[in-house]
């Protein structure tokens, strides 16, 4: 029988983030102690009022509009306009089963080339590969807070020589946990060259200091804002995300609606109705407590690992760190991460999965291996956190960091 799988698809591997989680679970079943620092999932419960809204609407069983429930689209537009000072209307919003699907369909639609900062989230590049879009990487470094400079972006646009291009910009960043500080300068270059920006703002509500700033404020006509419930609302398994697309990109939006109709049809009705509660109710206390915990845990990991053998940028949002290890033993970050897992039980994702050159000893560390329900329940309100709280409610983080520190010092 001839091969029934297309050659292109046969070259793909499972998503690195999902693969490391499955590998960790297999090791745990064999009796090995594993510190699950490889999988990025919010450890916190969905806010009670949002859960109750889902229960209340569980009987909703009709197909909804391919673009999404109009009431939900309206409240998301208002939410963005209030929090980000945007000017979106309900017709600018498209609801999807997570932003990942919407990004994939956008890659299929887009007639041009893709610009990705390295590091970037693990699925941008494979999606571009499937869609047969050429990817242009911009290598960044800790000195630029793991974001590209405006000059780097302009040089890359010029090298593409007149082709349409789209820049994926994720802040707070997965995998580095840093926040982009040069949005205005990037926006000026994008506007000058009519570059489309896909602003992946899934972690925006988990910015630790100050109010989150969106690049859409500086370049509204060319920026697609992408976000959803998975990170700030602890609802990764609910699979609800959205795109906010400016009227100037009407053709892209209309094409995306067509692909939505020919793929997932519409997002789960009960989830969409429950999401109205998420975007209209006051979740400020919940978010304050969640950010307090994440900031404390992230800074604990940073302070205990940052040294002359491990270089890390201070966490600014989300729940990741991107340590760079100093050693000459390994030829690739993949080899290094396998050694760490084998010798310490600490599961990390190699920097090469995020577009970083293999010979750079970088890895993503997700500091969410703890019971967020207990941590949140017992430390909410004005309670100031200390290391005793960490040892009590996040022992895997404490022990895993100790193991990783011991491993790094062995070199």
Please identify what each model-predicted range represents.
Residues 158, 339-348, 354-411:
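PLP-dependent enzyme catalytic core of the Aspartate aminotransferase-like
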Residues 276, 292-302, 312-325, 361:
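Conserved glycine-rich beta-strand-loop-beta hairpin in the small C-terminal domain of fold type I
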Residues 221-292, 303-304, 387, 401-402:
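Conserved core segment of the aminotransferase class I/II
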Residues 3-97, 280-281, 374, 388-393, ...:
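N-terminal small-domain helix-loop-helix segment of the aminotransferase-like
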Residues 27-30, 131, 189-193, 308, ...:
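Helix C-cap/helix->beta junction micro-motif
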Residues 116, 137, 197-199, 350:
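Hydrophobic residues in well-ordered beta-strands that form the structural core
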Residues 109-128:
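Conserved PLP-anchoring active-site segment centered on the Schiff-base-forming lysine
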Residues 142-210:
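Active-site phosphate-binding strand-loop segment of PLP-dependent enzymes
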């Amino acid at each position: 029988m001839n091969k029934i799988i297309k050659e292109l698809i046969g070259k793909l591997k499972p998503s690195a983030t999902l693969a490391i989680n499955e590998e960790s679970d297999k090791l745990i079943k064999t009796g090995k102690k594993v510190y699950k620092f490889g999988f990025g999932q919010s450890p916190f419960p969905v806010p009670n009022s949002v859960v109750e809204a889902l229960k209340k609407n569980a009987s909703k069983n009709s197909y909804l509009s391919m673009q999404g429930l109009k009431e939900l689209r309206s409240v998301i537009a208002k939410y963005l306009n209030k929090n980000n000072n945007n000017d979106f209307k309900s017709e600018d919003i498209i609801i999807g089963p997570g932003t990942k699907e919407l990004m994939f369909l956008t890659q299929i639609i887009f007639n041009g080339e893709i610009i990705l900062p390295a590091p970037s989230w693990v699925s941008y590049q494979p999606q571009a590969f499937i869609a047969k879009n050429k990817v242009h990487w911009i290598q960044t470094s800790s000195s630029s807070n793991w974001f590209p400079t405006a000059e780097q972006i302009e040089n890359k646009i010029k090298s593409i020589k007149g082709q349409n291009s789209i820049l994926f910009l994720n802040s707070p960043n997965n995998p580095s946990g840093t926040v982009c500080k040069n949005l205005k300068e990037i926006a000026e270059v994008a506007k000058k060259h009519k570059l489309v920006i896909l602003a992946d703002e899934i972690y925006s509500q988990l910015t630790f200091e100050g109010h989150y700033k969106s690049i859409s404020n500086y370049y509204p006509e060319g920026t697609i804002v992408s976000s959803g419930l998975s990170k700030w609302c602890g609802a990764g398994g609910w699979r609800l995300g959205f795109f906010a697309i400016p009227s100037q990109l009407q053709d892209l939006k209309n094409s995306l609606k067509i692909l939505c109709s020919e793929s997932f049809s519409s997002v789960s009705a009960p989830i969409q109705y429950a999401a109205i509660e998420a975007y209209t109710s006051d979740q400020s206390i919940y978010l304050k407590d969640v950010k307090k915990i994440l900031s404390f845990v992230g800074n604990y990991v940073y302070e205990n690992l940052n040294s002359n053998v491990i270089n890390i940028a201070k966490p600014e949002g989300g729940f990741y760190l991107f340590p760079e290890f100093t050693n000459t033993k390994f030829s690739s970050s993949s080899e290094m991460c396998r050694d760490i897992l084998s010798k310490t039980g600490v599961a990390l994702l190699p920097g090469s999965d995020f577009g970083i050159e293999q010979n750079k000893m970088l890895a993503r560390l997700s500091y969410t291996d703890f019971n967020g329900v207990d941590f949140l329940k017992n430390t909410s309100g004005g309670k100031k956190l200390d290391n005793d709280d960490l040892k009590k409610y996040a022992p895997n983080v404490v022990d895993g960091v100790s193991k990783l520190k011991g491993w790094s010092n062995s070199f």
